Amino acid sequence: MNYKTSIRNFDNKDWVWPERDIVAWRYLTREDHYNLPINVSNLVKNRNIVVQAGGHCGLYPNKYASLFKKVYTFEPHPENFYCLDQNIQQDNVVKNNLALGEKESMISLGEPLTKKKNNTGGYTVSGKGNIKLISLDSLDIEGCDLLHLDLEGFEWFALKGAVNLINKYRPLIVLETNDYCEMHGYTVVEMEQWIVSELKYKIIDKWEHDTVYAPE
């Protein structure tokens, strides 16, 4: 499929980007957001494998590729994944055009949560469709030192689908935490109570909309 894209320059690199997007570009290229992978990585003892989702157009996977030996990135939206695939050519990045959740299904992605047509960064699971959703536990991932999820309110379902991975490798976990989750029937408080009681993790840091959890 042909997508309308443009070339934008940031951090001494040309990026293939959705032509209509303004909001996500401004947000992700803001210094504090673009440097989030660096800040997170400083808390990780062993930088071998990071599992990151959603990958959007590749800014975070690109940064993580320079910080970890191997990166697994997930981006379900076709247009965003096309851009990610063009932007990320490093051999240590495994790119997956998949959504993450609790169990395998076929889903659709709704309009960006901001309701703005010039934002490609806010799509969320909105029902049945033709996009494949899988659980992390269904994959043969050989390790995980950091699990970073930014799924527009779908983070808890992805965590439930990664319990075996988390229990086996005990990675540092970073989640976007905001009220988007309420569209999917839960609150941040409920999710964090589950993280503490079931996964045996604790909150160790927070940056704006992102919360960091470490094993007890």
Residue ranges, per PLM feature:
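Soluble or luminal CAZymes and related metallo-dependent hydrolases
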Residues: D32, P76, K128-K132, F154, ...
